[in-house]
Structure formats: structure tokens, C-alpha cells
């Protein structure tokens, strides 16, 4: 079998590795090197016998993803372009947030909080009219290992301590629920205590609204957070923005969300990309309040981030504030997402497009 076709070491849960590697305690040693020390080669794994190292090199590739380009924003955000074994590329973004907590002495402690937005597919089938990723069409699903390697590469590149809290958002290139089996297995591997130990409650899946898959995800009860890319309050506009809405309309999505098991401490996030003169009116806000009636919801308003060639425009700040204030007055928790990476190619597909066009 060609090396590029072999499963990666990152494709396996700890229990699966215990079945493969003998004696089974070797699996935990390998996991420790992969996810606690972020080893980039088997030669670094000094407590493994030479025969095992050679077997791992031959049959379980570790170097499945390379950083080919990255851009750092003034706000600390970093956009990554990764090259895969078949030379396709995907993007991920490290978002750096400022966190403020009160310690046991009542003192304010300031720290940094990390969120990583990762991709699920090379390209995308959904074809959203506002998204640059759609321009390239769909190529393939990411493997389980390619999900995992995005986080490992970013933690290694930024020397993020193994015990540093980190949030994962499945909101990069592609539709995660269209890659259901690989996505859900990645959730499992990310959360393994002997591995990266990223709590499932720190993982959020963002979907364009495949109602049947939302139902299926709810039945698995993975205890992850759900975010819906809604972006419109009527089917006509949503079908323009997200053509898949013709198959899964707003009513079917809302029905699936109402059946989704939600942690009582959390809410279902509804992402609403605000586009000037498209969906930024108070009339739209009124319809949104009505749609979300009976749902434990939070609305996250997002400024449209323009890219070359799009006809859509960024909304005015005053209209965003009016929209937010109206929802809050009606009892719907609403925030405006802090824009990150405005001075870099932070929107999905932008860095990939720049690299393809040979731009620096």
C-alpha cells in the first residue's frame, strides 16, 4: 500500500492502539508522545524499542500534514494553511482571547484563552454564496487523523502547554456533519484523558443545517455544543445564501434543534452572518425572535468579512447594534462576535485562495 494511503497514527483511539501494539502498554507510551509532547517523528520516542519504531514508521505515518503558510494578525490570531499527503490544502485558525478571572484572594487574574477553528473537508458541498471555500467545490472528506493533526500541529507550533485549556470549533472549511463518522470519532479522540484531554463541552460543531444529521448527532449524545449557521429568517433568502436550504428548510432545522439534547448550562448557538441590506433590518430581528421561541438559544451576530469578487457588503455598526439590542430586549441573548484576523486572510478559504494565486 502506498504511504499516502496508509492510515495515520492519529486515526486511532487509545483502545484501538492497544489492540494493535503489543504489549498493550506501548499504546499509552505512543499516546503520551503524540499528545503530551507533540512528537513530530517516531525517532523522538526514546522509550520505544527500535523494532517498534521501525514498524510504526512503515505502517502508521505521523507526518501527514505540513504547515505551508501562516499569517499572524495584530490581535494575535494565526491563520494556518496545511498541505496534506495528497497535496490538497486546508485551513485552520488559532484565535487568541483575553480571559479575566477572580482568584481565591479576590484578585483579577488575566490570562490568554485559545480557540482553534478547524476544517472538516477539502472544499465543501454546501456551496454557500458568501463563502470563498465554495468556489473550489468539494474534493474529499478529511480523515480522522487530519482532524487531530490540525490541533497537534497548532499546539506544537505555539508551544501550548498540554494542560492549557483549549476550545475546538468545527467551523473551518467544509461541513462537519457531512463527514459524520470521521468527525464524531475525532471528538472521541480529542477528549481522551490520556491524549489531548479536550473536554467535549469545549468542542462546538457548527453546521449549515443538515436536519437529519442534527437528529443523528443528538441520538449519539456526545455532549458537545451545537451551533447552527442560520444567517436568514426566511427560506427565500436562506436558499440564496445556503442552497442546501432547499433540501433542509428553516422549519426542519428548528424542529431538529428542539429535539437536540442540550447541557442545561449551555445554549444552542445560532450564528447569524449579517450582510448589509440583506438581513440586517429590525423586521428580520423580529422574525428571528419568533423562530427561536421555545429554544434555549443564544444568537451570535457576525460581521460579513468581505473578500475580492464578492458583491456582499459589511453591515454598518449602528445596524448591528440595533439588531443586537432588539433581540436582548426581547429576552434572546445576543452578542456581536469580536472580529478577529481582519488584517489577515481570516475568512474560510481566503488564505488557500491567496496561495493558489501566488500572492504573498
From Swiss-Prot:
Its keywords, alphabetically, are: 4Fe-4S, Cytoplasm, Disulfide bond, Iron, Iron-sulfur, Metal-binding, Methyltransferase, rRNA processing, S-adenosyl-L-methionine, Transferase, tRNA processing
- Looking at the record, the residues that make up the Radical SAM core domain are 110-343
Q: Where is it found, in Gene Ontology cellular component terms?
A: cytoplasm
Show the catalytic activity. Answer: adenosine(2503) in 23S rRNA + 2 reduced [2Fe-2S]-[ferredoxin] + 2 S-adenosyl-L-methionine = 2-methyladenosine(2503) in 23S rRNA + 5'-deoxyadenosine + L-methionine + 2 oxidized [2Fe-2S]-[ferredoxin] + S-adenosyl-L-homocysteine; adenosine(37) in tRNA + 2 reduced [2Fe-2S]-[ferredoxin] + 2 S-adenosyl-L-methionine = 2-methyladenosine(37) in tRNA + 5'-deoxyadenosine + L-methionine + 2 oxidized [2Fe-2S]-[ferredoxin] + S-adenosyl-L-homocysteine
Which residues of this protein are catalytic? 91, 348
Disulfide-bond pairs as recorded: 117-348
Comment on bound cofactor? Binds 1 [4Fe-4S] cluster. The cluster is coordinated with 3 cysteines and an exchangeable S-adenosyl-L-methionine.
Instruction: Determine the domain of life of the protein's source.
Output: Bacteria
What is the documented function of this protein?
Specifically methylates position 2 of adenine 2503 in 23S rRNA and position 2 of adenine 37 in tRNAs. m2A2503 modification seems to play a crucial role in the proofreading step occurring at the peptidyl transferase center and thus would serve to optimize ribosomal fidelity.
What is a GO molecular function of this protein? rRNA binding
The yes or no answer to whether the keyword Transcription is present is: no
Q: Which cofactor does it need?
A: [4Fe-4S] cluster
By its UniProt entry, which NCBIfam families does this protein fall under? rRNA_mod_RlmN
Instruction: Note the PANTHER family from the entry.
Output: 23S RRNA METHYLTRANSFERASE, RADICAL SAM CORE DOMAIN-CONTAINING PROTEIN
- Tell me the protein family, please: Belongs to the radical SAM superfamily. RlmN family.
- According to its UniProt record, the EC number is 2.1.1.192
Q: Which residues hold [4Fe-4S] cluster?
A: 124, 128, 131
UniProt cross-references to Gene3D superfamilies, sorted A to Z: 1.10.150.530, Aldolase class I (3.20.20.70)
Q: Name the chain's protein.
A: Dual-specificity RNA methyltransferase RlmN
Query: Which parts of the sequence bind S-adenosyl-L-methionine?
Result: 174-175, 206, 229-231, 305
EC category: transferase
Organism expressing this protein natively = Aliarcobacter butzleri (strain RM4018) (Arcobacter butzleri)
What does the further note read? Reaction proceeds by a ping-pong mechanism involving intermediate methylation of a conserved cysteine residue.
**Compartments reported by the entry:** Cytoplasm
Q: Name one GO biological process term.
A: rRNA base methylation
